[in-house]
A protein has these predicted regions:
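Membrane-embedded transmembrane alpha-helical bundles that form the catalytic cores
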Residues: 1-518
Length: 519
């Protein structure tokens, strides 16, 4: 059951809303939370019932581990809490590792050793990458003393809440629980329903009208790419088409998740904020899958960087040696993990490593500029200021770099990725493949790029209503040329109704799975 399906929009969602608010009115918020948790499990089971025991195990195990870790903290036994945390992490990561990476590891080992050993095909449980990271964050926060006093009902809802269960955002316990404990939780608020519906409608339109349309052009280009004839035009058409498909697909999902949660009176953290407007790779990663990057920064990068920086300082390292120890090593480790988190394949390994190199180049450039400005200040000269056209140049360079990594992200093999990438670099010539950009695809690409560059994103349209937990962090930043904000007046209602109507009409072409469901 997909968010972009008739059975969800006209069946499951209304039933879940009615059951939730009716239970809250007559039996109270705690009972309403139980009902919403059960609805979330039904939603999850609709895809593949056999995955439900894995999700339930993850919920029960991590709740119990969280309880004993928190108890150890209360008894002032930090070593005990740390040991319990290690046990919890080993179990969670072992579960993820078996289901997601066992086939990949065995296939590569047998290829190297020449063994004929085969492993039965392991089906990846839906959303295991997302809910595993969410549970890991909960356990680590419990060990750090950030989380305490967890109840089974509220944890069950936190761990299964269907709007964010399948593809994020990866939420922190501290972001959701205060809302579940609020006196207004499960109390019907027409404001939340309307705001949530508008956000959901915008996200649905991004998915059904734009992303799924682009998929019809992107998929044939990437099918057996290594066996096709490529040139510069065809290569960049494939890169741009998939890049915009992925952008609108994930942007649409992120909007729908926030909108659905808001209908139930819950605000989720922002997970997507116009990343293609970024003028650097570092800024891009601040805007793309924001909660995943937050997780990696807090639970991977910093635990590597802090001891590496201490080690560097103790040995008096400076210059490139200090940079390598304190920044390069943590960055490479973090982005390598980010790559393989997305998928078990060499294309994802390369995706992570290339992005690590991009980020390190960006860091070196920023540090170099800071050094120049420090020297200019000492010489009593005005510091270098980034001009408008320089920003445009950075933006174009960022998009150019992303074109290659998006190919890695989409290609089914390294050979396919290389076939397209070498064409994008001009190695296969210009016009040699006899490829001509279809007029309709050209118009769709131009219109989509105009929407991305010129129009406000959903958070900016709904800025007045604080659509996300952390929306205030981005308020007033990076205003687009054609700014418009939604209001609950006649124009606003007509806009929302028209967007929802068009989005639903486009569902009739077929219901495509969200791209991030594959991770």
């Amino acid at each position: 059951m997909l968010f972009n399906s008739f059975v969800f929009i006209f069946g499951f969602l209304p039933a879940a809303l009615i059951a939730f608010y009716a239970t809250g009115r007559w039996l109270g918020a705690r009972a309403a939370a139980v009902v919403l948790s059960l609805a979330s499990l039904i939603f999850y089971a609709w895809f593949r019932p056999r995955d439900v025991p894995i999700l339930l195990f993850a919920i029960v195990f991590n709740y119990l581990m969280g309880q004993v870790i928190q108890r150890a903290r209360r008894l002032d036994r930090p070593a005990h809490a740390k040991a319990l945390l290690v046990i919890g992490l080993v179990v969670d990561l072992s579960l993820l590792g078996y289901y997601k990476y066992a086939n990949f590891v065995v296939d590569n080992v047998t290829a190297v050793t020449g063994s004929d050993y085969t492993l039965h095909h392991i089906v990846l449980p839906l959303a295991i990458s997302f809910f595993t990271f969410q549970k890991i964050a909960y356990l680590v926060d419990s060990a750090r003393g950030v989380v305490s006093g967890t109840g089974p009902v509220e944890f069950g809802l936190f761990a299964s809440f269907f709007p964010q269960l399948l593809a994020g955002p990866i939420v922190h316990y501290s972001e959701i629980i205060p809302q579940l404990r609020s006196p207004t939780f499960s109390r019907l608020m027409s404001r939340d329903l309307v705001i949530g519906l508008v956000i959901f409608a915008i996200g649905l339109a991004k998915k059904t009208v734009i992303a799924d349309t682009l998929a019809g052009y992107a998929d044939p280009l990437y099918l057996h790419a290594a066996g096709q004839t490529w040139d510069l035009g065809r290569g960049w058409t494939a890169a741009a088409t998939y890049a915009l498909q992925l952008y609108m697909d994930f942007s649409g999902y992120s909007d729908m998740a926030i909108g659905l949660a808001r209908m139930f009176g819950v605000k989720l953290p922002l997970n997507f904020h116009s990343p293609l407007r970024a003028a650097s790779i570092i800024d891009y990663w601040r805007r793309w899958h924001m909660t995943l990057q937050r997780f990696l920064l807090a639970y991977v990068y910093q635990p590597i960087a802090l001891p590496m920086n201490r080690w560097s300082a103790e040995r008096g390292l400076t210059g490139w040696s200090a940079f390598t120890a304190g920044i390069a090593v943590p960055t490479l480790g973090t982005f390598l993990l980010s790559g393989i988190w997305h998928g078990a394949g060499w294309t994802f390994v390369l995706f992570g490593l290339i992005h690590a190199v991009y980020v390190l180049i960006n860091e070196i450039w920023r540090e170099r500029r800071k050094l120049i400005n420090r020297r200019r200040r000492k010489a009593k000269l005005a510091p270098l200021v980034i001009g408008r056209w320089e920003i445009v140049g950075y933006h174009v360079l960022t998009l150019f770099a992303l074109g290659f990594t998006n190919v890695m992200f989409r290609a089914t093999s390294v050979a396919d990725a290389w076939a397209i990438s070498r064409a994008m670099l001009g190695f296969d010539g210009v016009g040699t493949a006899g490829y001509t950009l279809p007029v309709d695809l050209g118009l769709i690409l131009a219109a989509t790029m105009a929407v991305v560059a010129l129009f406000p994103n959903t958070q900016q349209i709904m800025e007045k209503f604080r659509p996300a937990v952390n929306a205030a962090l981005w308020t007033g930043t990076h205003q687009p040329p054609l700014m418009w904000r939604w209001r609950p007046d006649a124009k606003g209602i007509v806009f929302a109704g028209l967007v929802l109507f068009v989005a639903v009409i486009f569902i009739q072409r077929g219901q495509a799975v969200f791209l991030y469901f594959n991770f």
